[in-house]
From Swiss-Prot:
Lineage, highest ranks first: Bacteria, Bacillati, Bacillota, Clostridia, Eubacteriales
Family note: Belongs to the CobT family.
The protein's name: Nicotinate-nucleotide--dimethylbenzimidazole phosphoribosyltransferase
SUPFAM superfamilies named in the record: Nicotinate mononucleotide:5,6-dimethylbenzimidazole phosphoribosyltransferase (CobT)
Keywords: Cobalamin biosynthesis, Glycosyltransferase, Transferase
Organism (species): Desulforamulus reducens (strain ATCC BAA-1160 / DSM 100696 / MI-1)
Gene Ontology biological process terms, A to Z: cobalamin biosynthetic process
């Protein structure tokens, strides 16, 4: 059995008995029912995922950041050149990027992995290699990768999770680095939903109107050339996806198989979540949406996943920065259900 098939076979629904027990506990606490909103949803969802009536704080918090390049940047869809990808990797490894700062604040570890940066393999202390190939091919003229490479990218993400996250309970957040990666993400969303490319394509790194129109045309051309099958996640990933998108989909599937909650970041991790959901619909039960990105397609992604974002921060950086902000929110939800007094304990009359 392949690693992907084995992982998919292990994914189960969260424990509904534990969910119901957690909901009863939340309703008995000294507050009007439901008054802590999404914080309560997080608490009972965690109970089901951890398969305990009272969810526990994570013993390990890890932000897994995957880096990969995209052949479609040859079409001029990004404001930044491709060499920024390896330059930013070195910034991550030196602790100077946005994700490093926010993960430090949250007490989380950052793991940076090269899954498909263009050019020769990068040799840098602290960089994990799970390379599938040297960047994807240009999906405007043909498939981004082969179906076998798509499977390898997903399995690389599963393996990375297994190697880097050992403690339980754990909390994992995903992030990425890859110049041009909003282009395949928009293509993936269009492939799965059939929505007009114009409505779901944004400015990415901040391109002007002229380049935005060009980006839309490139995505349309890629969808026409490749004709990805919306009912086959591997087909969509291989034809118009990215290696880091496949890797993040693998991390999500691995978390679902291991009973680990996984925090999504923005638009690119949302594309990975759609691929994961296509391969294993139950995997969405393990996903938490950290924030709503300003990329126009992100709201559509979250609707398709059935997830509500915790935050609206007008962010569009990627790297896992929005996901890192969710760490203390999730831990707060755990503390609320465990530490807040019930009406009976506090001697407070119920409404």
């Amino acid at each position: 059995m392949t690693l992907l098939a084995e992982t998919l076979s292990k994914i189960q629904a969260p424990d509904q008995t534990c969910v119901e027990q957690a909901k009863q506990r939340l309703d008995s606490l000294t507050k009007p029912p439901g008054s802590l909103g999404i914080l309560e949803d997080i608490a009972w969802r965690l109970a089901g995922i951890q398969r305990v009536p009272l969810p526990q704080l994570p013993r390990e918090k890890v932000s897994l950041v995957l880096a990969g390049d995209h052949g479609v940047v040859a079409e001029g869809v990004s404001a930044f050149p491709q060499e920024v990808t390896p330059q930013m990797i070195f910034n991550f490894l030196q602790g100077g990027a946005g994700i490093n700062v926010l993960a430090r604040q949250a007490g989380a570890k950052v793991v940076v992995a090269d899954i498909g940066v263009a050019g020769p393999p990068l040799e840098k202390t602290g960089l994990v290699s799970c390379r599938v190939k040297s960047g994807t091919d240009n999906f405007a003229v043909g498939p981004a990768m082969s179906r076998e490479e798509a499977v390898k990218s997903i399995e690389a993400g599963i393996s990375l999770l297994q190697q880097q996250v050992k403690e339980r309970p754990a909390l994992v957040a995903i992030g990425e680095m890859g110049i041009g990666n909003t282009t395949p993400s928009a293509a993936i969303l269009a492939a799965f939903t059939g929505m007009p490319v114009e409505e779901i394509t944004g400015r990415g790194t901040g391109i002007d109107n002229q380049r935005l129109q060009h980006k839309i045309a490139v995505i349309k051309r890629g969808l026409e050339v490749n004709r990805p099958d919306a009912n086959d996640g591997l087909d969509v990933l291989s034809k118009v996806g990215g290696l880091e998108i496949g890797g993040m989909a693998g991390i999500i599937l691995g978390c679902a198989a291991e009973g680990i909650p996984v925090v999504l970041d923005g638009f690119i991790s949302g594309a990975a979540a759609l691929v994961a959901q296509s391969l294993a619909p139950l995997s969405r039960e393990y996903m938490f949406a950290s924030h709503g990105s300003v990329e126009p397609g992100h709201r559509i992604m979250l609707e398709k996943l059935g997830l509500k974002p915790m935050l609206q921060m007008e962010m569009r950086l990627g790297e896992g920065t929005g996901a890192a902000l969710a760490y203390p929110i999730i831990e707060s939800a755990v503390r609320i259900i465990n530490e807040m007094a019930t009406f009976a304990e506090a001697g407070v009359s119920k409404g």
